[in-house]
Amino acid sequence: MWMFSWLCAILIILAIAGMNTIAKTTPHTKFTKKSEEREMPKGLKPSSGPPPEEEETLFTEMAEMAEPITKPSALDSVFGTATLSPFENFTLDPADFFLNCCDCCSPVPGQKGEPGETGQPGPKGEAGNLGIPGPPGVVGPQGPRGYKGEKGLKGERGDQGVPGYPGKPGAQGEPGPKGDKGNIGLGGVKGQKGSKGDTCGNCTKGEKGDQGAMGSPGLHGGPGAKGEKGEMGEKGEMGDKGCCGDSGERGGKGQKGEGGMKGEKGSKGDSGMEGKSGRNGLPGAKGDPGIKGEKGELGPPGLLGPTGPKGDIGNKGVRGPTGKKGSRGFKGSKGELARVPRSAFSAGLSKPFPPPNIPIKFEKILYNDQGNYSPVTGKFNCSIPGTYVFSYHITVRGRPARISLVAQNKKQFKSRETLYGQEIDQASLLVILKLSAGDQVWLEVSKDWNGVYVSAEDDSIFTGFLLYPEETSGISP
C-alpha cells in the first residue's frame, strides 16, 4: 500500500515538472539590435527564469554596445527559454502564470557539477625568504683509521755544532814520491804599440822680436849672486896690419895734465925693423908730455878673463810685435819610455804547521826581484807608497785553521776553516790595501787553530804586488 502511494507521488512530481517545462517555452524573440558575439563569462549558467539584478545590469551594458542585426544571437542556444536583450519581449501566458509562480521564489541550488579540466600551470612564484637555519645535527660516529701516510721530505740541515777540542798531532807521514815536472807555461801576449801623440796644430813658433830701446840706468843695486860661467865665444878673425905712421916732431913741454883714466891693455905690437946704430948723442932735456892721441882701432880679442860680478837688472823692454810663422822643424828623436815603479812577490810555505802568533815564514821564493819580501822574517816591506793587492791560498788539513792578515801592526782581515780528521781543504783571500812607505804586511795563525799544511802534493802560497803608486802630482797614474 505504501509502495503505491510512493509511485503516485513520483508520477505527480513528474507531471508537474513536465508542465513547468512546457509553460516556460516561448516563441523566438525578435531582435532589433545586433549583440556582439562574446564568450559567455566563466561561471555563468543557463537559467529558466528572468536573470537576477546583477545579470540584468550586465546584459543592459552589453545591449547598449550592440548594433542592429537580423539574426538571433548565438547565445540563444545557451539560454533556450529566456531572452538576453531586450527584456520587453519576455512573455508569459496568463494560463501558465499559475504554474510558473515558482519562478518568483528563490532558485534552489542544483546539484554540484563535475570538476572542470585542470588548468595550465601558473607562472613560477618569487623565491621565498631564507628560512631559519635548523639545529646542528648529531655528531656522527668516529670514522675508521686512515691509511699510513707517505714518507715526508728530507728536512733542512741543522746549524753547525760547536767545534770539538783539537786532536793530537798525528805522526809524521812518510815523504811522498817526487812529482812530475810541470809543463812550461805559455808566454804572455805582447802588448799593443801605443798611439802617437797629437801635434799642436796652432802652436807656431814666432820670429824673434826686435830689441827694445835701452832703458835709463837704474839705481845702484847691491852685489848680485855669482853668475854662472858663460860659454866660450867663437874665435874672432885677426885684423889687418896697420901702416907704420910717420915720426912726429918733437913737441914742447906741455903743462902737467890731470891723471887720465887707465886705458885698456893693448895687444903686443909687432916688432919693428932693426935700425942702424946711431951715434951717441948728448942727452936732451926732458920734453913735456904730448897731447893724448885718438883712440886706436880695436885690436884682436884677448884671452878670456875672469867672470865679473853680476850686473844690475835692467828695466823690462817693450814687447815686440808677433813674428811671422816659422817653418816646421825637423822631427825629434824617439823619447825613452817612462819608468814605472814595480814591487811584487810570491812565496810558498816549506814546512807544515808553522808556529802560532808570529809571522808565517814563506821560505820558498817564487818571485821577489825587487827584494821587498823577506823570507827570514816572513814580512813584506813597503818601499813605494801606493795601492797593493795581497792574496793567499792556504791548504788546511787535520785540524782547524784561523788565519789573519796583519798590516800596519793591526789584524786587518781574518778567516777561519773548520776541519777535522784527515780531510783536506783550501782557504783563500784577496784584498786591496793602501800602504805608505815603511809599512809591513804578513800572515799569522792563532793558537790551537793551526791547520796550515804543505806537502809535495799541496802548496800554501802568499802573494802581493803594487797595483799603482801613490799620486805625486795632480794627474792620476
UniProtKB/Swiss-Prot annotation:
User: Which residues are recorded with the post-translational modification Hydroxyproline?
Assistant: 133, 136, 163, 166, 169, 223, 283, 301
Q: Which GO terms describe its biological process?
A: otolith mineralization; protein homooligomerization
- Compositional bias (Gly residues) spans? 182-191
Residues that the record marks as modified (5-hydroxylysine) are 178, 310
| Compositional bias segments (type: Low complexity) | 298-310
Q: Which Gene3D superfamilies match?
A: 2.60.120.40
Pfam families found in the cross-reference section: C1q, Collagen
Q: What is the annotated localization of this protein?
A: Secreted, Extracellular space, Extracellular matrix
Q: Which UniProt keywords apply?
A: Calcium, Collagen, Disulfide bond, Extracellular matrix, Glycoprotein, Hydroxylation, Metal-binding, Repeat, Secreted, Signal
Secreted among the record's keywords? yes
**Is Transferase among the key words of this record?**
no
Q: Where is the Collagen-like domain?
A: 116-175, 209-268, 278-337
Q: Which SUPFAM superfamilies match?
A: TNF-like (SSF49842)
Q: Which SMART domains match?
A: C1Q
Q: Where is the composition biased (Basic and acidic residues)?
A: 33-42, 147-159, 226-240, 247-277
UniProt GO cellular component terms: collagen trimer; collagen-containing extracellular matrix; extracellular region; extracellular space
Task: Give the main localization category.
Answer: secreted
Q: Where is this region: Disordered?
A: 28-55, 111-337
Show the GO MF annotations: calcium ion binding; extracellular matrix structural constituent conferring tensile strength
Q: Where is the signal peptide?
A: 1-23
Briefly state the protein's biological role.
Collagen-like protein specifically expressed in the inner ear, which provides an organic scaffold for otoconia, a calcium carbonate structure in the saccule and utricle of the ear. Acts as a scaffold for biomineralization: sequesters calcium and forms interconnecting fibrils between otoconia that are incorporated into the calcium crystal structure. Together with OC90, modulates calcite crystal morphology and growth kinetics.
Oligomeric and partner information: Homooligomer; disulfide-linked; probably forms homotrimers. Interacts with OC90. Interacts with CBLN1.
Q: Which family does it belong to?
A: Belongs to the OTOL1 family.
Its domain description in UniProt is: The C1q domain mediates calcium-binding.
Name of the molecule in the record: Otolin-1
As recorded in Swiss-Prot or TrEMBL, the protein's gene is named: OTOL1
